[in-house]
Amino acid sequence: MDGLMTAVVKQYHKEGADIVKKEIPKIGPDEVLIKVKATSICGTDVHIYVWNEWAKSRIKPPKTMGHEFVGEVVEIGENVTSVKVGDLVSAETHIVCGKCRACRTGNAHICENTLILGVDTDGAFAEYIKVPESNVWINDKNIPLEILSIQEPLGNAVHTVFSGDVVGKSVAVIGCGPIGMMAIPLLKRTGAAAIFAIEPADYRRELAHKLGATRVINPLREDVVSIIKSETEGYGADVVLDFSGNPTAIRQGLEYIAKGGRMSILGLPDNEVPIDITNNVVFKGITIQGITGRRMYDTWYTVKGLLKSGLAEDLKPIITHTFPLTEYQKGMELMIKGQCGKVVLYP
């Protein structure tokens, strides 16, 4: 397909991004061209926009931003057989090699040669995006576009929540950004006994309560450890899920986690996190898990089933703002201030 399209591009090594006109991507024999119908803003996009230290070390401008999306297939390569023009699709954002040890042992989500849409390759903040056929996920057309556009981060939440048992457990959710928020209805739907949402932003605490948290805690004003201990008969939380990457919050989590408990960490700390391994890990007999992305493609099938069973309706309050793609800056500002849930853009 020839022609120009509108895209949000990180053009320079500095804060911000630009709306530009650029050529519609040309696909190869194993690729698919997708017309983007909706795309959502991720925390990674914010990092790239504000140009933090991670972005400076990873991003090579010019780069079209964005990686969470839903769209319609408009062109397929000559070797493509599993996708057809007209399919409503999203995409796994980790483009993997399929040849390294991780890929060959069922751990493609931690492929040693991963490329990420909107980070290493041009992304979805555009009218069109190209992706490998192997990354395309065919959607259920009965699910709203806004919900389909957030399946990638929802997959992160699903991977984190279900990396262990949560049924009948007391669960602490650290950080109620969009992915942390998604964990709450997941936990509620699957039978967690208590859900503690730990979040400093007033807006997000209110939304966490609306989504089903049994107790919301402001860590800047309340004693998180005492509250969780007192509401779990002194035992502590069976499961601690960190979506914040905040070193203080992670250390606190190790204080209020129950003996034999599980901590799963998706959040990315900016600095090293000193912890008391002897008393809070070894003597407590806990398990600490690092979570990266989505298990490919187990997590996607789980997401599909959950959305079909009613989770799509549960998630609607998380999408708090929508804008045309050309007004992406409004969404970025809301994300930076923590005054939103999920922000969806329409090209």
From Swiss-Prot:
**Keywords, in A-Z order:** Cytoplasm, Metal-binding, NAD, Oxidoreductase, Zinc
Q: Where in the cell is it found?
A: Cytoplasm
* InterPro entries, per database record: ADH-like_C, ADH-like_N, ADH_Zn_CS, GroES-like_sf, L-Threonine_3-DHase, NAD(P)-bd_dom_sf, PKS_ER, Zn_alcohol_dh
The organism's superkingdom is given as Bacteria
Major subcellular location class: cytoplasm
Which molecular function terms from Gene Ontology are attached? L-threonine 3-dehydrogenase activity; zinc ion binding
Q: Which PROSITE patterns does this entry report, sorted A to Z?
A: ADH_ZINC
Which pathway is recorded for this entry?
Answer: Amino-acid degradation; L-threonine degradation via oxydo-reductase pathway; glycine from L-threonine: step 1/2
State how the cofactor is bound.
Binds 2 Zn(2+) ions per subunit.
Which cofactors does this gene product need? Answer: Zn(2+)
Please list the disulfide bridges: none
Q: Which residues bind Zn(2+) 2?
A: C97, C100, C103, C111
Record PANTHER family = L-THREONINE 3-DEHYDROGENASE
Protein name from the UniProt record: L-threonine 3-dehydrogenase
